[in-house]
Amino acid sequence: NIILQDKTGIMDGKIWDPNSLGIDDFDALDYIDVVGDVTSFAGAMQLNIKRVRKAAEDEYDPADYLPVSENSTDDMYSQLKAFIGSVENTYLSALLKKLFIEDEEFIKAFEGHSAAKTVHHGFIGGLMEHTLGVTRLCDYMSKAYPVINRDLLITASLLHDIGKTKELSSFPLNDYTDEGQLLGHIYIGAQMISDLAGQI
């Protein structure tokens, strides 16, 4: 018994003879290519699987299987870099660049994470979309109230949820990690910033 899922819903799948030709090994949460017949059992649709194999990375688009931001990741990342480029304070700029420009592992995690499990922006790209929304509001407020330190406010808005890259697991799970359960994203993010600041 397996459960098949895409962004439209789930369906039960049955592999009646796991040792037959055409049934390749795969693990839970793998993207798989299946061939089979759809039947109805107890009022529900199920797929009797004849062939299955693990799909190669270039054979699928996660957007077809998981909730994804309607905004382009590349466009959002360009907007994020523009905000970073607008920060004039040398140290704050260096801090942002070290994380959002130089740290490829972090960038990949940030682009692919949600902002929450279910409450808001619970989809791939949700963390970046949420962060940009907060940063736009802060940018507006800094123009409306010139007494505000814009560089500090923009930096804080860009960094405020970075701990969520460690608090939540990546998709398709999008669930709390042990570290996330024990520490929470605010503490995790503060520690990440402290570690980065120590390198500047």
Feature map (PLM): residue ranges:
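Short, acidic/hydrophobic/Gly-rich beta-strand patch recurrent on exposed beta strands
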Residues: 2-6, 170
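Metal-centered catalytic cores of metalloenzymes
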Residues: 7, 35, 69, 124, ...
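OB-fold single-stranded nucleic acid-binding module
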Residues: 1, 9-12, 18-64
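Divalent metal-dependent catalytic cores for phosphoryl transfer on phosphate-bearing substrates
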Residues: 118-120, 129-130, 140-200
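A ubiquitous short alpha-helical element
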Residues: 62-68, 121-124, 177-181
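A short mid-domain helix/strand-loop element embedded in enzyme catalytic domains
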Residues: 93-137, 159-163
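Extended, charge-rich, solvent-exposed interface segments
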Residues: 46-112
